[in-house]
Structure formats: C-alpha cells, structure tokens
C-alpha cells in the first residue's frame, strides 16, 4: 500500500513532464515556422523594392548606352563581396554598356531562360552562388527603357546565407529560453504534485 502513492506520484509527474515537453516542441516549431515565413516575406519584399528602385534609376542615352547612378540606400551594395549586388545589362540589340554595384567585383552568372523562364510580367527569381561562397536570392526583370524597344536586364541580389544565419540565431535563442522555461515549469509541476499528493501518504 505504501508503494501506491509513490507509483501514482511518479506516473503523474511523468505524464505532466511529457506533456510539458510536447507543448514546448509544438511552441518551438510554430514560432520558428512563423518567424521564418515572416523573415522570408520581408526579405523578398526588400529585394522587390530594390529592383523597382533600380529600374527607375536607369535610362538609356541617344546612342543606346545604359546610363544612371542608382543609389538603393543600403551600404551593403557598396561593400565588396558583401552578398548584396545589383547589375544592369543589355537585353536587346542597340543597347550597350552595363552598370553594377561597387560590391559586385566579379561576374555572377544567371541561368538560361529555358531553365528559369520569366513570368508574364517579365520577372523571375532564382538562387545563385555569390562571390564569397554565399547563397544569393536573385530577383531579375527585363524592362523596356524607351519607345525604341530597347530592353535591359535588371538584377538585384540579396545574401540568403545571411538570412539563414539570422533565422538560425533566432532559433538558438528561442530554444534556450523555452528550455529554461520548460525546466522551470516541470520543476514547479513536480513540487506541486508532490505536495498535493502528500495527504495520500498518510
């Protein structure tokens, strides 16, 4: 008879502990998933905004040469090999020259149109390898610059590896906080259960 309260106490504590661990796992998964989705949406929105700003900052001269001095308002586009780049290249006959950010110290190839086709708005996105080994998210668009049907290809590239590092750092911090909270909750539950079942031992 004396063993019964102890067995009951163990089972109740074990059940509450398993439930607390399961709840923490669900909360961790839910929060990290929502954070990743929000971060990726914000990242894509930023690249899209930079792309439209770039398109609005470039023109073509009378002899068909690309002109402009785009300023996207982000210092990372001026830091060499930062993982944040932009470029403007001719995409039709009669257009010459090219523009690129000072951060882009080398060429970054783009996939063929067959491999990654443009959508109905003449835009496409893909992942590429950066100049420093980072992964890049690339937003690309072809745009008609004037009435002469002169077309240029605009690309804005963001450091996707940097985004993944930020998400991983958030996940580590969240895991630490939830672990501390979980251990505290389990300890409090155990103490409460032991105290609550004490009358059964008499």
Give residue spans per PLM region:
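Alpha-helical transmembrane segments of membrane proteins, especially the N-terminal anchoring helices
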Residues: 1-41, 146-202
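Juxtamembrane segments flanking the first transmembrane helix
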Residues: 2-92, 165
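Compositionally biased, intrinsically disordered low-complexity regions enriched in proline and serine
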Residues: 36, 44, 78, 85-87, ...
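Conserved long hydrophobic alpha-helices within structured protein cores
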Residues: 48-55, 132-139, 197
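Extracytoplasmic
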Residues: 103-176
């Amino acid at each position: 008879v004396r063993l019964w309260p102890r067995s009951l106490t163990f089972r109740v504590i074990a059940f509450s502990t398993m439930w607390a661990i399961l709840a923490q796992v669900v909360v961790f998964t839910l929060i990290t998933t929502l954070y990743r989705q929000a971060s990726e949406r914000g990242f894509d929105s930023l690249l899209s905004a930079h792309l439209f700003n770039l398109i609005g900052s470039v023109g073509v001269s009378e002899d068909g040469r690309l002109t402009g001095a785009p300023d996207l308002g982000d210092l990372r586009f001026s830091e060499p090999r930062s993982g944040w780049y932009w470029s403007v290249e001719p995409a039709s006959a009669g257009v010459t020259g090219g523009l690129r950010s000072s951060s882009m110290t080398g060429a970054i190839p783009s996939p063929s149109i067959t491999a990654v086709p443009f959508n109905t708005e003449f835009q496409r996105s893909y992942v590429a390898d950066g100049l420093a080994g980072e992964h890049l998210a690339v937003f690309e668009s072809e745009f008609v610059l004037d009435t002469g049907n002169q077309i240029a290809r605009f690309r804005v590239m963001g450091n996707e590896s940097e985004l993944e590092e930020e998400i991983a750092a958030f996940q580590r911090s969240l895991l630490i906080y939830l672990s501390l909270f979980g251990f505290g909750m389990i300890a409090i539950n155990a103490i409460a259960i032991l105290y609550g079942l004490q009358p059964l031992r008499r």
